[in-house]
Amino acid sequence: MVDALVPTHGGDRVNLDGAAGRIDVIEAHVDDVGVVRDAAAASEVIFNLAGQVSHVESMARPRFDLEINTASQLGFLEILREAGSNAVVVYTSTRQIFGHPRYLPVDEDHPVSPVDVNGISKSATEQLHLLYGELYGVRASSVRLTNVYGPRQRLRDNLQGVLPIFVRRALSGEPITVFGDGAQERDCLYVDDVVECLLLAARSTEVPGEVFNVGNDERLSLRAIAEEVVAAAGSGSIESVPWPHDRDAIDIGSYYGDSSKAKRVLGWEPRTSFADGIARTIEFYRSHRSRYL
């Protein structure tokens, strides 16, 4: 595993405690030529999950976002090209590339029109992966994820998405802040379902050059999500506040994806209901409070 282990973006060796002795951890950036070249040469599959995911952070530090999410990824692809790597590359993109949905559920044919720097950088990097496949034979595909949550996600700041924020505040007995009426709908993906999808993508011979929208058939409003988190935690509360301008400017409204292609091509199905997933998540953090809160 090659990981820069940046703490504020989820890197934490604690997450690997159960895998000691079964994996090699190399602390390096994704565009480190020597490290990536050697790792790629020894790999049949590369799961490319490197990047920063905060939309708000991408607006506050746009150059940083582009450096992490696009420039370094271009360096990674160049390493694969120069090495003539034959590894299958599964890249994790985001639903944010679509911007405001023109129709729901959103399928792969929906126009790409991001509303923040993170969406732009992730969209550009997805296109680079596909381009390097067409021109140089890099066997890349892209899986567009939405609202991933579950054990071992970083909770200590606001850089990993809305669900970690909700979980942290509920477990700390603090109010969960919902902007506006919280009516925007989302589909949330439990981490185990994401892992299964990535493994299926890596095994499929039909995947290189393809993109997949991956979400959950269960749709919940943000307020309903907050209510489920509070109920599972048995603590916390919910307060509604007006939209801050910086958040309102990049909010996309309701979003839920059409995963028909992933189901048809990969044989993937989301198996975890939000109620079950959030209960497992809350229990994990309650049992490991000192490490994550």
Protein language model features and the residues they cover:
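Short, solvent-exposed loop/turn segments at secondary-structure boundaries
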Residues: A60-R61, Y103, V117, Q153-N158, ...
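A conserved pocket-lining segment of Rossmann-fold NAD(P)-dependent short-chain dehydrogenase/reductase
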Residues: S58, D109-H110, V138-L155, I165-L189, ...
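C-terminal substrate-binding subdomain of Rossmann-fold SDR/epimerase-dehydratase oxidoreductases
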Residues: A28, L171-L293
